[in-house]
Amino acid sequence: MGSHCSKNRSCRNYVTPTQKSNVREILKREHEHIMQGIVAFSCNISLENKNMKKNRYPDAPCFDYNRVVLPIRKGLDDYINASYVDGHNMKRRFICTQGPLEETALDFWQAVYQDRVRVIVMITKTYEDNKQKCYPYWMTHERSTVTYGELKIRTKKIKSFRNYKVTTLCLTNTNTGTVLDIKHFAYEDWPQGGVPSDVNNFLDFVLAVRHADSKTEVPISSESRVKESPILVHSSAGLDRAPAFCVIDICISKYSESAIIPLLTTVRDLRRQRNNCLSLSTQYIFCYFTVLQFVMSTPC
């Protein structure tokens, strides 16, 4: 929704309670329009027989052109169901991926290591309705360690907030001695196929991630505007909740620069980068009202 909100007007009166139902209908129609668009990029690598078992869901392949390509390792190929996603005026701000399977946890950490990821965002529970949605790829107790190949991941500190947890991890490549300090943000109050009950809580989570990312001392290439340490975002399938986080982050950045909430164009662009993502109108609407809450809480 390309909705203008001048910084000189009262943002708190931008959408009144009586207007919300009308806005929801507009957003629903916008989403229907987006879903009618055809995104014709190949997914051949994802659909190869040898790689299908690495996809958590068989109907969720990733595009070939922007997939994360892992280094060839002994006995392993270069495939992971993960996509590079652009941010606002920034190439590859995100890696958007599925929740790891047990057999792809090593691939997950290889992607973290090769792209020097410093912030991981997890928007799923490990189990929901007695089904595994994400393999627990890190240790949930302080001073505990798990090893995948040459990569050792130590849990240093866990801090709990009202609606999310932040875990400080230390990743060490035992072959090279390279060490990465990583912040792992876990938000578990967004059910698969639904939306959180409170936009304020999720907005707090998004802003906490943005603050942590801003503190990482990793440069952006001035020529290509490529982020050299992308934020890795995952849910279970990596198709709705994880892309929704990306959309909200992008819209916040765009609003901060130009005072508009360009939801439609942002989602349309993101669907060209992560296959079949953001297919639910309820989540599209949630993205808008989360960004709107940011607008309302920002001095005009």
Swiss-Prot record:
InterPro entries: Prot-tyrosine_phosphatase-like, Protein-Tyr_Phosphatase, PTP_cat, Tyr_Pase_cat, Tyr_Pase_dom. This is Tyrosine phosphatase-like protein J1. GO terms for molecular function: protein tyrosine phosphatase activity. Residues 27-294 form the Tyrosine-protein phosphatase domain. It comes from the Viruses. Pfam families: Y_phosphatase (PF00102). PANTHER family: RECEPTOR-TYPE TYROSINE-PROTEIN PHOSPHATASE, TYROSINE-PROTEIN PHOSPHATASE 1. Belongs to the protein-tyrosine phosphatase family.
